[in-house]
Amino acid sequence: MIIGHKLTKEDKDKINDFIKKYYHLYPDYLQEEIDNKAMLGFTNNNDTINQIYCFLNIDDKDINPYFYYYNYLKNIYNLDDMNILEVGSGTIPILASYFDKNITLMDKYLIEHFYKDYNYLKESFDEDTNISDYDLVIGYNPCQATESIIRNAIKNNKDFSIALCGCCFLPKEYTERTAKKWHEYLYRIATELGKDNYDIRMDYFDKRYHIENPIICGKKNK
């Protein structure tokens, strides 16, 4: 869904200039996304396009979900005193741009040109990824890595927070494969694994963002 303002000529010129400079850095499947959707407007569900808009400062600040999520995290965790790992940071590190330099970014498909000012790991995250250097693991729509973040963080006694996407990665034995069932499954996994020493919560974006998917957080009990 398009939720941003109608693009001005200046906005379109910025996008065209971006495409001329950086289009070749994107993999084929994301080039197709840019071809089809770059000029449609800011959305409630397309990170590739939204990250470009934020990078170019043509996003509507009051519906920028990355900034909302950052402020949400600030209200729950003492971010200044934490080493943070962001999983699935995407092609352009928009969420990370709101943090101080205490954040490391991980994404197998990140575009290194946009990450030169950050510590980053161009690799996938799984349940066995070494997170010993971090206090908090976060992800904004990390898709397939979502369950691994929860399991890995709880196993290693780390705080975690994930803004969930609308995909579904339920184990194959589940027949009702919807985003809602996936979110319920993740919450159940988190509460079962963290029952002894975690406060697990599920929250939602404000209505103006038109994002139905929840945010799941796990904070260690002190």
Regions found by a protein language model. Give the residues of each.
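Domain-level detector for long C-terminal conserved domains
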Residues: 109, 117-222
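Alpha-helix C-terminal capping segments
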Residues: 73, 77, 96-99, 115, ...
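Hydrophobic, Leu/Ile/Phe/Ala-enriched alpha-helical segments that form helix-helix packing faces
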Residues: 19-23, 73-77, 96-99, 153, ...
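SAM cofactor-binding core of SAM-dependent methyltransferases
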Residues: 86-125
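Short, composition-biased local secondary-structure segments
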Residues: 60-71, 114-128
